[in-house]
């Protein structure tokens, strides 16, 4: 599953 950390990396 995708990690929230990767999502924040886009920010």
From Swiss-Prot:
Keyword Nucleotidyltransferase applies: no
Subcellular location(s) per record: Secreted
Superkingdom of the source species: Eukaryota
GO cellular component, one term: extracellular region
Pfam family, one: Tachykinin
InterPro entries, sorted: Tachy_Neuro_lke_CS (IPR013055), Tachykinin_dom (IPR008215)
Residues where Methionine amide is found: 11
Protein family according to the UniProt entry: Belongs to the tachykinin family.
Function: Tachykinins are active peptides which excite neurons, evoke behavioral responses, are potent vasodilators and secretagogues, and contract (directly or indirectly) many smooth muscles.
Protein name: Ranatachykinin-A
Organism, scientific name: Aquarana catesbeiana (American bullfrog)
């Amino acid at each position: 599953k995708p990690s929230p950390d990767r999502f924040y990396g886009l920010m």
